[in-house]
Amino acid sequence: MTSEGFFERVYEVVEQIPEGMVATYGQVALLAGRPRSARYVGYALHSNPRPGQIPCHRVVFADGRICEGFAFGGPDAQRELLMGEGVTFADPMHVDLGACRWPAGL
């Protein structure tokens, strides 16, 4: 699979994450067919060609942490988008994965 093909598969997976839920970079990598490529998921999302359509704000680190380098407005923007969808937070930088993790691939 080329990196371009992988990026498109990442976008397809992320488009399936329901509003009010989150997935981890590793989870998206697994579902996109490259289970050890969480970092490349980050690269793909940073290059998101359709930010209004591909909800990259719904992808977080394995510990629930939101991305300090969120490409579309920083962590405050990511937090605001997630909270607007009803995602609960354990603290200002970590979503409550127990309450809002998308179960696909687990």
Locations of the language-model features?
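Nucleic acid-binding interface residues in structured DNA/RNA-binding domains
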Residues: 1-106
